[in-house]
Amino acid sequence: MEGVLYKWTNYLTGWQPRWFVLDNGILSYYDSQDDVCKGSKGSIKMAVCEIKVHSADNTRMELIIPGEQHFYMKAVNAAERQRWLVALGSSKACLTDTRTKKEKEISETSESLKTKMSELRLYCDLLMQQVHTIQEFVHHDENHSSPSAENMNEASSLLSATCNTFITTLEECVKIANAKFKPEMFQLHHPDPLVSPVSPSPVQMMKRSVSHPGSCSSERSSHSIKEPVSTLHRLSQRRRRTYSDTDSCSDIPLEDPDRPVHCSKNTLNGDLASATIPEESRLMAKKQSESEDTLPSFSS
């Protein structure tokens, strides 16, 4: 239903005409009929609101959601208000009846499911007792007489009947559960983004290729690893050979111990000393020997 109703806005503008539309239990209003495509200025859900009729004015009515919304509306005449009251009341009643039916169905299925579950527990206890009885018959003490075939047949028939009843009750529980929890509830129309498969980014693909290489890449990598390892092994063998050669020639001294080594201040500072040259060292040794020869003459 749709039509014009006056809505109380504020004390400055007072009652203003608005275009109201009642659809699927929701009452929405617009500035005019032409503004329906632009979107509503407000709405109220009939299932949760209260309809109140003004006691003095036969054209006024109120829609109230306690603590949330309060619509003051006025029709053109009493007949128009009555027409709106019937439409609003019918919409509210239909929604309420639908809700109560669903609640009744849910409560009834819950109670029946509880009853069947209690029956299953009872049959489970009976099964355990009957299985225990048959075990006692089978593992009977040798000192006593063996159980009769009649007792065994009776116990097995009771066990078979209890099993059949248990299975039947279990099937009824499954039917009740399927009626209560419909398949639509288990269909995920909007899958969770954390669970839904997402195409990996290029960076993730690179990481995956590095951390989890395929068979071909593993063969290549193993081959590339073997090559440097073999190269290192060859180098180490060569070094061992050179070390063994140097050890065999270790009788030859690396430095001549008779050669005098003169360390001057310059050599301590990191400069090359001139005394390290063989000719200059010989001259220095010659001068030193001459000075030693002249010392006895002075002493004498």
UniProtKB/Swiss-Prot annotation:
Interacts with GTP-bound ARF1. Interacts with SACM1L and VAPA and/or VAPB to form a ternary complex. The PH domain binds the small GTPase ARF1 and phosphatidylinositol-4-phosphate (PtdIns4P) with high selectivity, and is required for its recruitment to the trans-Golgi network (TGN). Plays a role in regulation of vesicular cargo transport from the trans-Golgi network (TGN) to the plasma membrane. Regulates Golgi phosphatidylinositol 4-phosphate (PtdIns(4)P) levels and activates the PtdIns(4)P phosphatase activity of SACM1L when it binds PtdIns(4)P in 'trans' configuration. Binds preferentially to PtdIns(4)P. Negatively regulates APOB secretion from hepatocytes. Residues 97-300 are annotated as: Interaction with VAPA and VAPB. InterPro entries: Boi1/Boi2-like, PH-like_dom_sf, PH_domain. Residues 1-100 are annotated as: Interaction with SACM1L. It comes from the Eukaryota. The lineage of its organism: Eukaryota, Metazoa, Chordata, Craniata, Vertebrata. Its main location: Golgi. Residues 197-300 are annotated as: Disordered. It comes from Homo sapiens (Human). Residues 1-93 form the PH domain. It is a peripheral membrane protein. Keywords: Golgi apparatus, Lipid-binding, Membrane, Phosphoprotein. The modification Phosphoserine is found at S236, S244. This is Pleckstrin homology domain-containing family A member 3. Residues 279-290 have a biased composition (Basic and acidic residues). One of its GO terms (biological process) is endosome organization. One of its GO terms (molecular function) is identical protein binding. GO terms for cellular component: cytosol; early endosome; Golgi apparatus; Golgi membrane; recycling endosome; trans-Golgi network. Widely expressed. CDD domains: PH_FAPP1_FAPP2. It is found in: Golgi apparatus, trans-Golgi network membrane.
